[in-house]
């Protein structure tokens, strides 16, 4: 009775161990992604071994120990320890086959895992040539290995494609940006130099315009003096006419005296004509001075020449005035002589009166011309002031352009630096992708 109960208990214990082993096998295969066919083969072998063992009657205790060892190894492998093995395979029949199958299964799982790890680790460093070696693998493990190898091959192709894209597409763009930044930096430097040169030129022109303004003021002063001289001439002519008028009642004494007075009057006319010519030339020179001042290019030099000519003409006018004064004095002398022969020069005095009136009219016309010259000189002064104001504006604009050029140069320098950094980053990234 006790023997029967003991056998029943051992048989019951074996019946409980077998499902446990089967569950652990299922867990191990789930962990490893194992084949369902292999799983059922192991289960079938296990059941046959157990049934055979029970049938034959063998040692239930030893069988229970072998199954316990198998369960322990399967538990370790299910926890991720693929180094676990059944070291002392003592079972025979179904139990022995189960133990050997477990060891072979773990050998395959470990070999596949190590190969997969080595291949993926190499790929992680860019060495895609490392593939999973399928020698010794069976069934689904071979399929899994081939799938991983194909994935590694595709990854290698994609990396190569990306590196080619980076070298052929991205890198040229980065280089183009860097070249453009360098060119922009050079252009901004040239622009800054040009702006600085423009500012210096504007300063030079401003100084020349200021000098031109001073020269125009000098011409204006000379014209005022010239106008005063004309007025003085007019006064002297009127005085001469008055003297001639006083001699109107004096008779002419001799023909010679009358001719002398007539000749003196003619010389006065010639001198007045000379004054008229000088005034015309002065007017022309004033016009040239206005044009030279408006050009603002070489205003200083051109205007200096014109001012010198005006000065010479003013000197000629002074000499003509002196000559006129001399001739008027001569007229006075002739008039004094005419007083002695008042009866003889009555008709001549009348002619002198008429001539004096003509001279006065000519002097008035000359005075009008002088006023016009003064007006033109004033306009020239205004134009010179406008040129000075414009040059100041140009100088300010050039200064702003210089500042802007400096800002562009700074931006271009920063862009160039960033382009260099980007180029280094792209090169480094390509290097990391190509040789990880």
Swiss-Prot record:
Positions of post-translational Glutamate methyl ester (Glu) modification: 225
Transmembrane segments: 9-29, 31-51
Localization (cell): Cell inner membrane
Keywords for this protein: Biomineralization, Cell inner membrane, Cell membrane, Membrane, Methylation, Transducer, Transmembrane, Transmembrane helix
Gene3D superfamilies assigned: Methyl-accepting chemotaxis protein (1.10.287.950)
Membrane topology type: Multi-pass membrane protein
Domain free text: Only the C-terminus (residues 321-436) is necessary to interact with MamK; its addition to MCP25 confers the ability to interact with MamK.
Function: Probable methyl-accepting taxis protein. May be the receptor that senses the torque generated from the interaction between the magnetosome dipole moment and the external magnetic field. Overproduction interferes with magnetotaxis, cells respond more slowly to changes in the magnetic field; requires the MamK-interacting C-terminus of the protein. The effect of magnetic sensing is to control flagellar rotation. Chemotactic-signal transducers respond to changes in the concentration of attractants and repellents in the environment, transduce a signal from the outside to the inside of the cell, and facilitate sensory adaptation through variation of methylation levels. Attractants increase the level of methylation while repellents decrease the level of methylation.
Periplasmic side of membrane: 30
Cytoplasmic membrane side: 1-8, 52-436
Broad class of where this protein is predominantly found: membrane
Protein name (database record): Methyl-accepting chemotaxis protein Amb0994
Entry superkingdom: Bacteria
Single GO cellular component term: plasma membrane
PANTHER family given in the database record: LYSOZYME-LIKE PROTEIN-RELATED, METHYL-ACCEPTING CHEMOTAXIS PROTEIN MCPB
Modification sites for Glutamate methyl ester (Gln): 211
């Amino acid at each position: 009775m006790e023997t029967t109960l003991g056998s029943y208990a051992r048989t019951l214990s074996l019946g409980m161990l077998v499902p446990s082993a089967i569950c652990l096998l299922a867990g191990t295969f789930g962990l490893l992604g194992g084949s369902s066919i292999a799983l059922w083969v192991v289960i079938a072998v296990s059941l046959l071994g157990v049934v055979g063992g029970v049938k034959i009657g063998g040692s239930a205790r030893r069988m229970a120990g072998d199954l316990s060892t198998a369960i322990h190894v399967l538990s370790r492998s299910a926890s991720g320890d693929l180094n676990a093995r059944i070291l002392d395979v003592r079972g025979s029949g179904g139990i022995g086959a189960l133990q050997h199958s477990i060891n072979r299964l773990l050998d395959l799982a470990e070999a596949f895992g190590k190969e997969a790890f080595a291949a993926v680790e190499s790929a992680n460093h860019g060495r895609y040539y490392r593939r999973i070696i399928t020698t010794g693998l069976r069934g689904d493990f071979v399929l899994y290995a081939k799938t991983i190898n194909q994935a590694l091959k595709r990854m290698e192709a994609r990396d190569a494609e990306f590196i080619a894209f980076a070298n052929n597409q991205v890198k040229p763009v980065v280089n183009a940006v860097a070249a453009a930044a360098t060119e922009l930096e050079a252009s901004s430097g040239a622009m800054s130099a040009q702006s600085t040169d423009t500012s210096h030129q504007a300063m030079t022109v401003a100084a020349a315009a200021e000098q031109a303004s001073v020269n125009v003021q000098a011409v204006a002063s000379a014209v005022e003096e010239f106008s005063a001289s004309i007025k003085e001439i007019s006064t002297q002519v009127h005085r001469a006419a008055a003297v001639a008028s006083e001699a109107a009642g004096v008779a002419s004494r001799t023909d010679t005296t009358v001719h002398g007075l007539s000749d003196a009057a003619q010389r006065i006319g010639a001198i007045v004509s000379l004054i008229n010519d000088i005034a015309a030339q002065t007017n022309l020179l004033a016009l040239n001075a206005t044009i030279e001042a408006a050009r603002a290019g070489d205003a200083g030099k051109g205007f200096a020449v014109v001012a010198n000519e005006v000065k010479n003409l003013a000197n000629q006018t002074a000499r003509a005035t002196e000559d006129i004064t001399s001739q008027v004095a001569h007229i006075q002398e002739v008039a004094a002589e005419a007083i002695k022969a008042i009866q003889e020069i009555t008709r001549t005095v009348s002619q002198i009166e008429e001539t004096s009136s003509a001279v006065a009219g000519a002097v008035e016309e000359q005075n009008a011309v002088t006023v016009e010259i003064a007006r033109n000189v004033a306009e020239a002064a205004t134009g010179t002031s406008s040129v000075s104001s414009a040059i100041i504006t140009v100088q300010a604009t050039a200064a702003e352009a210089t500042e802007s050029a400096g800002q562009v140069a700074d931006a271009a320098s920063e862009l160039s630096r960033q382009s260099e950094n980007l180029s280094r980053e792209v090169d480094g990234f390509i290097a990391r992708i190509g040789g990880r």
